[in-house]
């Protein structure tokens, strides 16, 4: 039987705990340590070895009630998560303990820290993933096995858009999904669990939560916990996995909360100096290999709507598609409030999506860009000062802008409108008809919150 290696708590600084070990038992970086905190198990993760046989650790739960001199056990391994079929339909915390009041799984567990796949193992694919959301499919096509970021400030609809993607993709895709709730509202996690149960996608989904009420240690590691489950589905089962992370900014934020306590000098805007390294470690593991793919959708909170903030700016470089949510569009009552001019995808290329799709998408972007340029003239001089050509362009641009809106399935109970999914070919055809002037005699109001272009004609015919 292996000897139990024990140390003692030396200092407690909020979520950071120093533990002194005998020199021969000093744990390695990223090792999980365990102790009994008034009847409940507390897990610490070694972050630094600061000399004098002291391991500086980050707590995965509250440190209330800890005292100096308390015994700590070195588990001699990193934090591990249950993986495989046993986690489907279940809900876990950062250390792999169930939080759905069901028994703990007893099968295989994997460490949350592991190297990213090598270049030789990685696979590149340019298969389009249809979402049923018009603005996304037309202007920001998603790649199967790609990384997608949903950028937006507070209250512009990131979580609703992500839940809509879960609803549309998880239902049609038929593969397995992992949802990691990183530092977001517990209420939203609760709603998501019951919505998934109702729509019969829960048995194909694993959920991991480290919500905003939890200590920074849990919020810092929960994205890795969810990723570990997704990697196992990809590598051991050869599956195409969907990984949803809401919200990747909270991962960075949690790192900055403990960074100063760990004795690091802050860098730009007070973030941790290791920001790019930590983000890279996580993002490089979210990739497709020759065994299977991980398609990840990540919500990214943008502090004060500033896209140049180091946290969202660091995330940008890792993504294939960037969906930017705009408060100005949300204030017009148009949802999803996706900015067609700020959102980009590297798949919007005629060689990937085809010439017809590409040309319609470019024309939509051009007409909206010109409409934006004309806004100042309209505001000062009014529509009458525009040329006939520009007036026609403005009318069509408004119809295009309205037609980009769409009722969502997950917001049905708030809006009272049934959700709609639209096939890609119907989306392309609809925008082509607007741009070619086939809808010039229909009022722009009829283009709001509809699915196919045929619905617009029906709506207009009814109101004649």
UniProtKB/Swiss-Prot annotation:
Self-association state and partner proteins as the record states: F-type ATPases have 2 components, CF(1) - the catalytic core - and CF(0) - the membrane proton channel. CF(1) has five subunits: alpha(3), beta(3), gamma(1), delta(1), epsilon(1). CF(0) has three main subunits: a(1), b(2) and c(9-12). The alpha and beta chains form an alternating ring which encloses part of the gamma chain. CF(1) is attached to CF(0) by a central stalk formed by the gamma and epsilon chains, while a peripheral stalk is formed by the delta and b chains.
EC number(s) given by UniProt: 7.1.2.2
Gene Ontology molecular function, alphabetical: ATP binding; ATP hydrolysis activity; proton-transporting ATP synthase activity, rotational mechanism
Pfam families, sorted: ATP-synt_ab (PF00006), ATP-synt_ab_N (PF02874), ATP-synt_VA_C (PF22919)
CDD domains: ATP-synt_F1_beta_C, ATP-synt_F1_beta_N, F1-ATPase_beta_CD
Primary residence: membrane
Membrane topology: Peripheral membrane protein
SUPFAM superfamilies the record matches: C-terminal domain of alpha and beta subunits of F1 ATP synthase, N-terminal domain of alpha and beta subunits of F1 ATP synthase, P-loop containing nucleoside triphosphate hydrolases
The UniProt record lists the keyword Transport: yes
Its biological purpose: Produces ATP from ADP in the presence of a proton gradient across the membrane. The catalytic sites are hosted primarily by the beta subunits.
NCBIfam families, per the entry: atpD
InterPro entries per the UniProt record, alphabetical: AAA+_ATPase, ATP-synt_VA_C, ATP_synth_F1_bsu, ATPase_alpha/beta_chains, ATPase_F1/V1/A1_a/bsu_N, ATPase_F1/V1/A1_a/bsu_N_sf, ATPase_F1/V1/A1_a/bsu_nucl-bd, ATPase_F1/V1_b/a_C
Catalytic activity from the UniProt record: ATP + H2O + 4 H(+)(in) = ADP + phosphate + 5 H(+)(out)
Gene Ontology cellular component annotations, sorted alphabetically: plasma membrane; proton-transporting ATP synthase complex
Keyword line: ATP synthesis, ATP-binding, Cell membrane, CF(1), Hydrogen ion transport, Ion transport, Membrane, Nucleotide-binding, Translocase, Transport
Subcellular localization, as worded in the UniProt entry: Cell membrane
Membership in a protein family: Belongs to the ATPase alpha/beta chains family.
Keyword Membrane: yes
Protein name: ATP synthase subunit beta
Binding site for ATP: 152-159
